[in-house]
């Protein structure tokens, strides 16, 4: 009995499952799929509107204190179309699906998933506005300890991050260092065995651990000194006027402002700890505008202990000459591996159905909220039959405060 050829539908179905399962970062994101795109096909630039969680304040006493529901939303754009294009021989298509998957599809999907994950990481890592670091007295970043990861967990808790299903993504080199130092730390015997045999942490310190090659190596700015020049006059300010700074700040740097402490996002009470902000626009030496996230939303009176407000982020407005400090400041630029602890809901990856051209050999499948399209066609110019597999996707950090950088020295 003659072998049957693998069909494009079989190839696509196998490819999408391999794609989702071959990259740890993609597996541990919030993945969304909008079937509205399936009616006419999605294209680069298609958008999804995402509502953010509402926030309210609590009254004390029987008197009603009505507050508006001030809904916030953001837009996720399907901005990137990635794919892999190959020529299959008839001999390839006569293989069993298992053989074809191992020899051809697995390396294709591993690289495609890695490329997509790299794009998402590049768009996400430098939006994180929290950091828990292990540093020496001079401010030099060291390899994180168990206390560093637990400090990150505490920071996430203060920001009302969901406790269940938290993840820790490490650079592979960081993972190796951490497994060595934490391998015997109050773990069940089976977990210690897994660490010994596999060289991975798996589950520890309230999170599921994994390593991924997409983790960024980040270089800080050379910032040494800077002060605010006036008090922000608008609640929710993200652009702060400063005196000409000494040194530089990079997008993704973490800074604090003297006298501006974080608040618990549920109780709105001050934590007594400096609120960390992420720099969103790079600053050169002598620049005078500091752009940050989150926005500065103090109490209604602008002073610590004042009446709470919706979406409050800090306990008080800064003084007009408050000092700005680079959190990783040791007097020079530092390069570190930007591992982080996070809730999967912090980052959303969305995909849409690409259109299916008429009169072509095509297939499209969805698996675990990821859509992939395949097209096979004959190229008359090169006398080849080629197949292309495409994913149209976009990503957005919905809640940067639900992530916390755990840096490791390079």
Model-derived regions: residue spans:
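Long, contiguous amphipathic alpha-helices that act as assembly "spine/axial" helices in icosahedral shell
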Residues: 50, 76-134, 140, 157-174, ...
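Structural signal for terminal/edge beta-strands and the immediately following C-terminal loop/tail
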Residues: 400-410
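Alpha-helical scaffold segments that mediate packing/assembly in large oligomeric complexes
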Residues: 95-103, 107-161, 174, 214-244, ...
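Short, Lys/Arg-rich flexible segments
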Residues: 2-33, 90-95, 108, 116-133, ...
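N-terminal "assembly arms/tails" that initiate or stabilize quaternary assembly
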Residues: 1-74, 403
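Internal mixed-charge
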Residues: 203, 211, 273-402
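Autoprocessing Asn-cyclization modules and mimics
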Residues: 176-295, 299, 312-319, 405-407
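Short, low-complexity, charged/polar segments at coil/turn and helix-coil boundaries
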Residues: 33-42, 146-181
């Amino acid at each position: 009995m003659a072998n049957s050829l693998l069909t494009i539908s079989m190839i696509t179905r196998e490819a999408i499952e391999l794609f989702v399962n071959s990259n740890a970062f993609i597996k541990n994101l919030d993945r969304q799929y909008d079937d509205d795109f399936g009616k006419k096909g999605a294209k680069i630039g298609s958008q999804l509107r995402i509502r953010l969680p509402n926030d309210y304040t609590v009254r004390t006493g029987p008197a009603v204190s009505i507050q508006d529901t001030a809904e916030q939303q953001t837009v996720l754009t399907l901005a990137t179309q990635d794919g892999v294009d190959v020529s299959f021989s008839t001999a390839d298509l006569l293989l069993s699906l298992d053989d074809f998957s191992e020899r051809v599809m697995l390396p294709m999907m591993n690289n495609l998933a890695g490329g997509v994950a790299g794009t998402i990481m590049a768009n996400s890592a430098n939006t994180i506005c929290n950091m828990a670091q292990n540093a020496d007295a001079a401010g030099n970043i060291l390899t994180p300890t168990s206390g560093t990861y637990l400090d990150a967990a505490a920071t996430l808790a203060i920001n009302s991050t969901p406790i269940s299903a938290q993840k820790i993504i490490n650079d592979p080199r960081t993972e190796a260092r951490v497994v060595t130092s934490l391998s015997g730390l109050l773990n069940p015997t089976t977990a210690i065995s897994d660490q010994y045999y596999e060289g991975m942490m798996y589950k520890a310190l309230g999170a599921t651990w994994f390593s991924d090659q997409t983790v960024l190596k980040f270089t800080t700015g050379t910032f040494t000194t800077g002060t605010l020049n006036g008090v922000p006059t608008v609640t929710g300010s993200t652009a702060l006027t400063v005196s000409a700074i000494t040194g530089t700040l990079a997008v993704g740097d973490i800074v604090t402002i003297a006298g501006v402490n974080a608040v618990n996002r549920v109780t709105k009470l001050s934590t007594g700890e400096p609120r960390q902000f992420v720099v969103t626009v790079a600053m050169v030496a002598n620049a005078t505008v500091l752009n940050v996230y989150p926005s500065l939303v103090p109490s209604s009176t602008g002073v610590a202990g004042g009446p709470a407000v919706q979406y409050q982020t800090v306990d008080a407005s800064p003084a007009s000459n408050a000092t700005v400090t680079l959190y990783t400041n040791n007097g020079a630029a530092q390069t570190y591996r930007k591992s982080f602890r996070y809730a999967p809901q912090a980052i959303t990856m969305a995909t849409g159905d690409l259109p299916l051209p008429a009169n072509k050999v095509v297939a499209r499948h969805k698996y675990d909220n990821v859509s992939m399209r395949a097209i096979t066609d004959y190229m008359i110019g090169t006398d080849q039959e080629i197949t292309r597999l495409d994913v149209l996707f976009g990503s957005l950090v919905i809640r940067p405060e639900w992530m916390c950088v755990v840096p490791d020295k390079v």
